[in-house]
C-alpha cells in the first residue's frame, strides 16, 4: 500500500513537471518557422547575440526557447535531423539540473546538444561526461560539426593526451571526456606547483551520459592517485601459503558446525572473519614461520598489519574469482568492472587486496601504493555549479539521486509507443537445466532469423554459453572484457537476421542495436562508393530489416538476474527502440548467486515441494515478485553502503576542500612573506610557553631546556641569560616578545645573505612540499582510523561521531606540525644550501603578481568554524 502510494506521488510529480516543460516546448515550436527563414550567416550570428544578452543581465532560462529553436534548426541543416518534441523535453530537464530518463534509441546524444549549447554561452565551459574513451571520441566527432556551425569550440579530453592538448580541451566551450579523466585531472590540478600547470577551469556544468552507471554503480570506487610504498612482496607470498591450511565454517550459526571452521564468509558484504579456532591456528603458523613472536596475539597493535594480510589473503582466495572479478594477463592481475564487464587496466584494489590476489595467482607482486590524493565520484561531481544526467534507467534510483545529489528524476515519454514483449522469468532448479533452456531458445530464434542478444553477469558465464554454442556449430559473437576491441562494431550489427551476440553486463552500452544491422556502419566500410552501390546496400538493409521485424525483432535473453533491477532493465532496453518490435526473457536457477544468497527460503522450499522434473521450469508471478523483492533487498543494502561511504567521505572532503583551497591560494600568491612571519610568531610562542609559565618571572622558568629547544629546532641562539642579567624583572610576556623579535631579526639577516627573491621562492616551495607530504601521511592515518572505527560500537560509542572527532583532531595536529616543520626548516637554511635547494627545485619556481596573507578574521583552515585568529592563527 505504501509503495503504491509513493509510486502515485512520484507519477503525479513527474506529470506536473512534464506539464510545465511542455509549455516551454510549445514556445520552442512556435519559434521554428522564424529560424527557418534565417540564412546560415544570420543563424550563426545568433550565438553572439545570445552572449550579449547574457552579459546584459538576462538568464539562461530567458533565452532557452530561442536557443533550443536555434539548435534544432542548425541540426536540420548540418545533420538533416530534427529534434523531436520529447528530445526538447529532455533538453529542458537537463538544463533544469534533472536526471532525464530516456529509453534506448530515443536519441540522447542529439538531446545533449541542446543544454550543452545553452550552458556554453556564458563562457564558463560545459563538460560532457561519458563512460569510456570510445564514447567520448565518438560523441565529440559526431556533434562537433553542429557546435562549430554555431560558433562554439569543442575539445576532447582523453587519458593519453599531453598537458597542452588537455589545456586546450578544457579551454573549449564544450569538452568531452570520461568521468575518470575529469576526476583525475582535478586531483592532479591540486598537486601542481604553479597556476600554469593546471588544466581545468572552475567546474561549471557537467552533463553526465549513462548517469546511473557513473553516479550510482561507480560511487563506491574512489579515484586515487598514489605513489609507491615499501616493498612487502615476500610477506604476501608467505601469508598466501597459510590459506590452504584453513577451512571454511560451513554454517556459522549452527551448533553442529560450531568450532569446526577456521573462518566464516559473509557473501552479502564480501567479508571474511576468523573464528576463535582459526585465530589460534593462524597464530601458531605465524609463530612457526617466525613472522610473529611467541606469546603475542594477532590482535595486538604491533601485529595488526599481519592480521590485515591474513584477511586479505582469505578474501583473495575465497571471494574473488578469476575470469569473474579479474583476469590474469601478461603476468598481471587486471580488474574486471562488475557493472560493465570491461577490464580496467591501471586500476588496483586498495588495502593490499590486489597484492594478495597477485600472490594467489603467482604473478609478480607490485609494491603497495600510498595514497597521494583521492576523491569519490559523489564528492567530485558535487563540486560543479550545475550537474545533470541522462540514462535509459533512472527511475528505480530516483530516491538516491535526490538524497545524495539533490537531482530530480524526470521520465521523458518515448517518441513512439513501446511494443516490446517482456515474458515472465523461467526458474529452474539447476544451472545445467537453465543453460539447456537458453540454448533451445537461441536455436528457436535462429530458425526464425530472429537476432538474439544474450546478457551474462560475468566473463565465466559468457564463456559457458559460448562453449555450448560452439558444440552445436552455432556462429556467434562474444563481448566481454577479453574481447572488447571491436565492441561497438559488433554491438551495432547485433540486429542482423539470425545473429547471436553474447554480452557481459551489457558491454556495448551507448551504441544502438538497429534491426537489420546498422546501415551507417555498413556504408562506412567503403572509402569510395558509387550512388548505385549505396542504393544496393540500402535495398539489402531494408530487406534484412523487414525480415527481422517479421521475425519478432531483437530477442533479449538474460542468463540470470543482476543484483540491481536497473541493470536488468538496461539489458531489456536494448530491444524495442523507437517503437520497434522485440521481446525479452530471463532464465534463472536456484544456483544463481542472487537466488542462493538473497532469495528467501520460501522460494527454495516451494521449488522442492513442486517436485519439478528435469528441464522443467516454474513460471509464476509470485516467484517473479519474490525475486524482485530479493533485488530490492540488495539495492537497499548497496544504497546504505554508498550513503555510509559518503557520510565518512564528507568528513575528509571538508578537510580536502580546506587544504586544496589554501594550497591554490599559496600557488597563486606572488609571495607568502607575511604569512611566514605570522607562522614564525605562532610556532615560537607555542614552544616558548612550554618552558615559561604564564604570569611568572625568571626564577620559575626552565631556561636551560628552552635554550636547547630553540637551538636544536630553530637554530636560534638567543642570549636569554644576558637579557635577564640586564633586566632581572623581565615578565613572561616581555621575554616571549624579545625572543620572537630576535628570531625575526635573525631571519631578516639570513634573507639579506640569501636574497629576498630567493627567500620568497624557498618559502613557497617549502610550504607546498611540506603540506603535500603531511597531507599524504594524514590520508594514510585517516584510512587506518576508518578501517578500525567500527570497533568503537562495542564500547557503546557512535563510530561516525568518533571518526569525525578523531579525524578533526588529527587534521588539527597536522596543521600544527605543518607550521612547525616549515619554521624549523626555514630557521636552519643557510645561503649555500639555499642556492642548492633552488637549483634542485627550479622547475617548480614560477613568479606571480599578488601577495597572500590569511585574513585574521577569515575562517580557519582546519574547518573548526572559528576565525583564524582564534584558532590556528592565535598568538
Swiss-Prot record:
Family indicated by similarity: Belongs to the SecA family.
Amino acids binding ATP: 87, 105-109, 512
Pfam family, one: P-loop_SecA
GO cellular component terms, A-Z: cell envelope Sec protein transport complex; cytosol; plasma membrane
Enzyme class: translocase
PANTHER family in UniProt: CHLOROPLAST PROTEIN-TRANSPORTING ATPASE, SECA INNER MEMBRANE COMPONENT OF SEC PROTEIN SECRETION SYSTEM
Topology in membrane: Peripheral membrane protein
Protein name, as recorded: Protein translocase subunit SecA
Provenance organism: Buchnera aphidicola subsp. Acyrthosiphon pisum (strain Tuc7)
Entry note: cofactor: May bind 1 zinc ion per subunit.
Gene name of the record: secA
Main function: Part of the Sec protein translocase complex. Interacts with the SecYEG preprotein conducting channel. Has a central role in coupling the hydrolysis of ATP to the transfer of proteins into and across the cell membrane, serving both as a receptor for the preprotein-SecB complex and as an ATP-driven molecular motor driving the stepwise translocation of polypeptide chains across the membrane.
GO BP annotation list: intracellular protein transmembrane transport; protein import; protein targeting; protein transport by the Sec complex
The reaction(s) this protein catalyses: ATP + H2O + cellular proteinSide 1 = ADP + phosphate + cellular proteinSide 2
Binding of Zn(2+), residues: 860, 862, 871-872
Cofactors that this protein relies on: Zn(2+)
PROSITE patterns noted in UniProt: SECA, SECA_MOTOR_DEAD
Keywords recorded for this protein, A-Z: ATP-binding, Cell inner membrane, Cell membrane, Cytoplasm, Membrane, Metal-binding, Nucleotide-binding, Protein transport, Translocase, Translocation, Transport, Zinc
Induction statement: Repressed under conditions of excess protein secretion capacity and derepressed when protein secretion becomes limiting. This is regulated by SecM.
Molecular function via GO: ATP binding; metal ion binding; protein-exporting ATPase activity
Amino acid at each position: 500500500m505504501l509503495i503504491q502510494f509513493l509510486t502515485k506521488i512520484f507519477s503525479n510529480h513527474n506529470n506536473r513537471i512534464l506539464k510545465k516543460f511542455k509549455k516551454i516546448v510549445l514556445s520552442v515550436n512556435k519559434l521554428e518557422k522564424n529560424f527557418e527563414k534565417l540564412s546560415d550567416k544570420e543563424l550563426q550570428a545568433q550565438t553572439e547575440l545570445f552572449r550579449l544578452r547574457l552579459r546584459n543581465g538576462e538568464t539562461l532560462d530567458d533565452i532557452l526557447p530561442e536557443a533550443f529553436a536555434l539548435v534544432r534548426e542548425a541540426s536540420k541543416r548540418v545533420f538533416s535531423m530534427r529534434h523531436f518534441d520529447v528530445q526538447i523535453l529532455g533538453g529542458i530537464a537537463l538544463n533544469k539540473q534533472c536526471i532525464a530518463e530516456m529509453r534506448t534509441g530515443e536519441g540522447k546524444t542529439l538531446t545533449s546538444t541542446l543544454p550543452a549549447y545553452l550552458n556554453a554561452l556564458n563562457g564558463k565551459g560545459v563538460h560532457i561526461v561519458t563512460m569510456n574513451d570510445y564514447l567520448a571520441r565518438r560523441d565529440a566527432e559526431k556533434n562537433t560539426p553542429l557546435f562549430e556551425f554555431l560558433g562554439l569550440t569543442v575539445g576532447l579530453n582523453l587519458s593519453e593526451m599531453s598537458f597542452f592538448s588537455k589545456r586546450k580541451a578544457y579551454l573549449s566551450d564544450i569538452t568531452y571526456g570520461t568521468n575518470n579523466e575529469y576526476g583525475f585531472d582535478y586531483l592532479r590540478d591540486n598537486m601542481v606547483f604553479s597556476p600554469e600547470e593546471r588544466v581545468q577551469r572552475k567546474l561549471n556544468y557537467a552533463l553526465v551520459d549513462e548517469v546511473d552507471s557513473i553516479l550510482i554503480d561507480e560511487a563506491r570506487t574512489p579515484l586515487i592517485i598514489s605513489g609507491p610504498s615499501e616493498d612487502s612482496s615476500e610477506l604476501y607470498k608467505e601469508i598466501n601459503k597459510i590459506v590452504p591450511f584453513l577451512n571454511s565454517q560451513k554454517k556459522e550459526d549452527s551448533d553442529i558446525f560450531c568450532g569446526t571452521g577456521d573462518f566464516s564468509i559473509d557473501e552479502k558484504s564480501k567479508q571474511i572473519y576468523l573464528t576463535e579456532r582459526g585465530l589460534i591456528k593462524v597464530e601458531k603458523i605465524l609463530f612457526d614461520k617466525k613472522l610473529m613472536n611467541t606469546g603475542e596475539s594477532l590482535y595486538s597493535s604491533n601485529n595488526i598489519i599481519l592480521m590485515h594480510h591474513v584477511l586479505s589473503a582469505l578474501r583473495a582466495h575465497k571471494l574473488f574469482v578469476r575470469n569473474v572479478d579479474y583476469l590474469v594477463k601478461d603476468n598481471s592481475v587486471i580488474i574486471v568492472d562488475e557493472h560493465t564487464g570491461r577490464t580496467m587496466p591501471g586500476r588496483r584494489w586498495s588495502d593490499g587486496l590486489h597484492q594478495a590476489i597477485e600472490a594467489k595467482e603467482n604473478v609478480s607482486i607490485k609494491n603497495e601504493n600510498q595514497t597521494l590524493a583521492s576523491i569519490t565520484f559523489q564528492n567530485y561531481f558535487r563540486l560543479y555549479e550545475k550537474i545533470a544526467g541522462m540514462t535509459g534507467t533512472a527511475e528505480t534510483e530516483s530516491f538516491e539521486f535526490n538524497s545524495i545529489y539533490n537531482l530530480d528524476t524526470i521520465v521523458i515519454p518515448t517518441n513512439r509507443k513501446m511494443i516490446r514483449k517482456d515474458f515472465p522469468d523461467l526458474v529452474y532448479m539447476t544451472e545445467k537445466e537453465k543453460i539447456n533452456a537458453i540454448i533451445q531458445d537461441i536455436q528457436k530464434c535462429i530458425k526464425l532469423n530472429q537476432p538474439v542478444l544474450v546478457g551474462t553477469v560475468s566473463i565465466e558465464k559468457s564463456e559457458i554459453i559460448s562453449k555450448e554454442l560452439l558444440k552445436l556449430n552455432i556462429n556467434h559473437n562474444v563481448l566481454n572484457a577479453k574481447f572488447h576491441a571491436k565492441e561497438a562494431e559488433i554491438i551495432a550489427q547485433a540486429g542482423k537476421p539470425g545473429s547471436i551476440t553474447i554480452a557481459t553486463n551489457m558491454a556495448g552500452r551507448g551504441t544502438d542495436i538497429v534491426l537489420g544491422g546498422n546501415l551507417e556502419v555498413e556504408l562506412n566500410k567503403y572509402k569510395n562508393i558509387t550512388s548505385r552501390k549505396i542504393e544496393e546496400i540500402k535495398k539489402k538493409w531494408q530487406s534484412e530489416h523487414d525480415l527481422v521485424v517479421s521475425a519478432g525483432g531483437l530477442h533479449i535473453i538474460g542468463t540470470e538476474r543482476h543484483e540491481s533491477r536497473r541493470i536488468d532493465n538496461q539489458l531489456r532496453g536494448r530491444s524495442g527502440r523507437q517503437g520497434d518490435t522485440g521481446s525479452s526473457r530471463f532464465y534463472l536457477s536456484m544456483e544463481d548467486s542472487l537466488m542462493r544468497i538473497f532469495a528467501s527460503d520460501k522460494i527454495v522450499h516451494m521449488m522442492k515441494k513442486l517436485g519439478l522434473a528435469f528441464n522443467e521450469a516454474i513460471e509464476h508471478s509470485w516467484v517473479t515478485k519474490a525475486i524482485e523483492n530479493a533485488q530490492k533487498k540488495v539495492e537497499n543494502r548497496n544504497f546504505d553502503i554508498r550513503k555510509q561511504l559518503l557520510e565518512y567521505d564528507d568528513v575528509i572532503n571538508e578537510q580536502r576542500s580546506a587544504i586544496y583551497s589554501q594550497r591554490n591560494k599559496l600557488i597563486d600568491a606572488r609571495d607568502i612573506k607575511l604569512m611566514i612571519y605570522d607562522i614564525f610568531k605562532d610556532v615560537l610562542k607555542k614552544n616558548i610557553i612550554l618552558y615559561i609559565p604564564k604570569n611568572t618571572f625568571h626564577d620559575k622558568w626552565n631556561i636551560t631546556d628552552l635554550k636547547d629547544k630553540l637551538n636544536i629546532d630553530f637554530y636560534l641562539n638567543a642570549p636569554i641569560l644576558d637579557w635577564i642579567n640586564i633586566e632581572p624583572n623581565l615578565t613572561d610576556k616581555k621575554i616571549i616578545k624579545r625572543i620572537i623579535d630576535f628570531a625575526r631579526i635573525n631571519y631578516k639577516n639570513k634573507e639579506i645573505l640569501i636574497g629576498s627573491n630567493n627567500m620568497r621562492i624557498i618559502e613557497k616551495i617549502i610550504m607546498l612540499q611540506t603540506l603535500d607530504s603531511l597531507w599524504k601521511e594524514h590520508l594514510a592515518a585517516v584510512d587506518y582510523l576508518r578501517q578500525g572505527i567500527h570497533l568503537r560500537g562495542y564500547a557503546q560509542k557512535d563510530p561516525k561521531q568518533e571518526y569525525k572527532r578523531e579525524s578533526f583532531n588529527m587534521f588539527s595536529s597536522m596543521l600544527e606540525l605543518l607550521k612547525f616543520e616549515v619554521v624549523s626548516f626555514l630557521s636552519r637554511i643557510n645561503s649555500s644550501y639555499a642556492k642548492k635547494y633552488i637549483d634542485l627545485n627550479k622547475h617548480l619556481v614560477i613568479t606571480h603578481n599578488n601577495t597572500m596573507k590569511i585574513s585574521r578574521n577569515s575562517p580557519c583552515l582546519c574547518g573548526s568554524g572559528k576565525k583564524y585568529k582564534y584558532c590556528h592563527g592565535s598568538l
